Amino acid sequence: MKHRKSVSLLLAGATTVAMLTGPVQAAEAPSPQELAAARLQSEGLMKGDENGELHLEDDLTRAELACLISPIILNPEHVAWETDWYTRMCTTNFNDVPEWAQVAVGVCTSMGTMAGYGDGLFGPSDPVSPQMACTVMLRYLEQDGWTYDTACEKAAELGLAPAGSLEGDALARGDMAILLTGSLDYLAYLQTL
């Protein structure tokens, strides 16, 4: 009997300690943005900064968008052979694109997926709006039946990204990762038809 009381007291004490210390925190599950970015990284499409950080919460710029999508718009091996041509395509038309983005901007503008503002301006540091990103992806997918104002609705309708990730004035890098993976999945689906 004495042994039973000791065990009961020990269990009661352990239960009390467990209740006071709280539940063990489970590892946080990756967000949809992190999952999409990890996929793009594994496919060599998304790269981080010099420290490997992706800055998924930061607004995407037009130059970053061009760098992100140029490898899917045109075969990277072809671009490697024609780097000088795509650089000239950019520098002939735009006077504000940094060197690191010139080839990608040249690819995107030559393929008609992106355009500048006129007067030699591309606006490489300008934030990408959700409408702009959806417009680029819908052009890439050669979709019709939409306008710039309805591009986000069309992208959501096609399942490229949830409508909630296509809101606001500027698109975060993580939300672009979702849109890009959705577009790649949609393209793969179209190729099965």
Predicted regions, residues:
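Feature responds to low-complexity, polar/acidic, surface-exposed segments characteristic
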Residues: K2-A36, S42-E43, K47-A66, S70-V103, ...
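Histidine- and acidic-residue-rich, metal-dependent catalytic cores
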Residues: C108
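Extracellular, beta-strand-rich glycan-interacting domains
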Residues: L180-G182
